[in-house]
């Protein structure tokens, strides 16, 4: 009887504690093929939940990075060398970030470290920043959305959240 009581108390405690783990956001992914080689991104999808993206990202000081998602860092994989303007991104796996500039513009940052928690950014592992174009989307995005779209002989990466959309073009080298 004593063992049964201990087992029941243990089960109740286990069930009570199981509900207190922090909820993780859903994950999103996008992929495209360039010259038969895969380019992909995997990211966390935080939701605004009634908040404004300007209020949240507006607090980020110039020179700091946004992890482009939630939870585990956003992962970008490419099986071919890519060219973003004058920046070459060699085929590899990276964590992906956006750095806020002093003029409130954004730069896309590929970091050689990947798989880390989304707040563990080592700037010494960054490739040069790539300017992002900011526009207003036709429809605001409640959750962070990252898309890869084929355009001619290259592609476009688009990052949307709320009424902000960031994008840049790239080509296979």
Could you say what each language-model-derived stretch is?
Residues 1-4:
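Positively charged n-region of N-terminal signal peptides that target proteins for export
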Residues 7-16:
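Bacterial N-terminal signal peptides
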Residues 8, 34, 84:
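Short glycine/serine/threonine-biased micro-segments
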Residues 17-30, 80-81, 88-92:
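Short, charged N-terminal helix-start/capping segments
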Residues 21-64, 114-173:
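Primarily secretory-pathway and cell-envelope proteins
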Residues 67-116:
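Mid-length scaffold segments of soluble, non-membrane domains
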